[in-house]
From Swiss-Prot:
It comes from the Bacteria. InterPro entries: CusB-like_dom_1, MFP. Belongs to the membrane fusion protein (MFP) (TC 8.A.1) family. This is Fatty acid resistance protein FarA. The gene is farA. PANTHER family: MEMBRANE FUSION SUBUNIT OF EMRAB-TOLC MULTIDRUG EFFLUX PUMP, MULTIDRUG EXPORT PROTEIN EMRA-RELATED. The lineage of its organism: Bacteria, Pseudomonadati, Pseudomonadota, Betaproteobacteria, Neisseriales. Probably part of a tripartite efflux system FarAB-MtrE, which is composed of an inner membrane transporter, FarB, a periplasmic membrane fusion protein, FarA, and an outer membrane component, MtrE. Induction: Expression is positively regulated by MtrR. MtrR acts by modulating the expression of the regulatory protein FarR, which directly controls the expression of the farAB operon. GO terms for cellular component: plasma membrane.
Length: 394
């Protein structure tokens, strides 16, 4: 009985040993496979870093920036109307606020009347000049008659038909006529001098002065309307109706949201291979990773962020600790991307720059054009001047 039981036990022991060996073999194979997979993954990661990732610089310290165009009046006054509020979209030239214009309207009407008077005065001076010219012609005719009378009497005096007294009277008449001609010529010269010479009505000094006053009054009246200096969205409105404002005081701001960029603050160690013109990809926290903006490096700041702070760092001390500095890098965005997915100033962005692309260390092209104030259109007041000059024509 004992020998019969021992044989099954030996067989079971052999089976257990076989299973254990198989398990150990499988475990070694798994470890080998895992080790090989890890090595391949590390090699792939190293290759990817060498081929792609080492040519990318990324930062999350980036924010949307743009121009905040201040709206200020060009003259002081009391605010009568405020036509736009925060978040309103406006176009360049739109009226944003209106100042009280009662005094300016009166000044404008007074200037128009002064121009009318200047034109009429010029007409009177023209008439006086014409009258002085007629007097010169009349006096010259009197002189010619006196000279003819003197010649006749002189011829008769030789035969004794005319007395010496009559001949003396004739000579006196000629002298008086000559003096009258000289006086008339002087009066004509004075009238022409007062007229300003042979120039057109518009070019007369008095008329030019009156036109200048009229344009000045019209400009002051026009400046009671505070207009938008650029296309954009109204922000930071602080002006209220009835408020007394001075020239240059900020009333509100206009932000051109179509012209925004990103200021990305890269570490100084990340700028080694970064150049102007290199492409960039940007992601906004507002829209998430599914929306990618295209852009390019436009320029580097002239100094680090701390260099332009109100209180620059003072490193000339014994307990100095080196801190990696960050340099603001401007990234311009593709206009089409911004139009499809508008951004707001101050939004957070994640920026990746492809440093393997070609670029220039220094910008050789001028930057984007800055907003300009709307130039004054003088056509309206010029038409008014033309109407006044035409109505005053003889």
């Amino acid at each position: 009985m004992k020998s019969g039981n021992s044989e099954p036990n030996l067989m079971e022991t052999h089976t257990d040993e076989t299973k254990l060996q198989n398990t150990q073999v499988k475990r070694k194979r798994r470890l080998t496979a895992l080790t090989l997979l890890f090595a391949l993954s590390a090699a792939a990661a190293g290759s990817a870093f060498f081929l792609w990732w080492q040519h990318e610089e990324e930062t999350e310290d980036a924010y949307v920036a743009g121009r905040v165009v201040q709206v200020t009046p060009q003259k002081g006054g009391t605010v009568r109307k405020v036509l736009h509020d925060d978040t309103d979209a406006v176009k360049k030239g739109d009226v944003l606020a209106v100042l009280d214009d009662d005094n300016d309207v009166l000044a404008y009407e007074r200037a128009k009347n002064e121009l009318v008077q200047a034109v009429r005065q010029n007409r009177r001076q023209n008439a006086a000049t014409s009258q002085a010219g007629a007097q010169v012609a009349l006096r010259r005719a009197d002189l010619a008659r006196a000279q003819d009378d003197l010649r006749r009497r002189s011829a008769l005096a030789e035969s004794g038909a005319v007395s010496a007294e009559e001949l003396a009277h004739a000579r006196t008449a000629v002298s008086q006529a000559q003096a009258a001609v000289k006086a008339a010529l002087a009066e004509e010269s004075s009238a022409r001098a007062a007229l300003g010479g042979d120039v057109s009505l518009r070019e007369q000094p008095e008329v030019q002065t009156a036109i200048g006053r009229l344009k000045d009054a019209w400009l002051n009246l026009r400046r009671t309307q505070v207009r938008a200096p650029a296309d954009g969205q109204v922000a930071k409105r602080s002006v209220q109706v009835g408020q007394q404002v001075a020239a240059g005081a900020p009333l509100m701001a206009v932000v051109p949201l179509s012209d925004v960029w990103v200021d990305a603050n890269f570490k100084e160690t990340q700028l080694r291979h970064m150049k102007i013109g290199q492409p960039a990809e940007l992601v906004s926290d507002l829209y998430g990773k599914q929306i990618v903006y295209r852009g390019r490096v436009a320029g580097f700041s002239a100094g680090t962020g701390s260099a332009f702070s109100l209180i620059p760092a003072q490193n000339a001390t014994g307990n100095w600790i080196k801190v990696v500095q960050r340099v603001p890098v401007r990234i311009v965005l593709n206009r089409e991307d911004v139009d499809r997915h508008p951004l707001r100033i101050g939004l957070s962005m994640t920026v990746k720059v492809d440093t393997s692309a070609a670029g220039a260390p220094v910008s050789k092209t001028p930057g984007a054009a800055l907003p300009e104030m709307e130039s004054t259109d003088w056509s309206e007041v010029d038409r008014t001047v033309d109407e006044i000059l035409g109505q005053s024509a003889p």
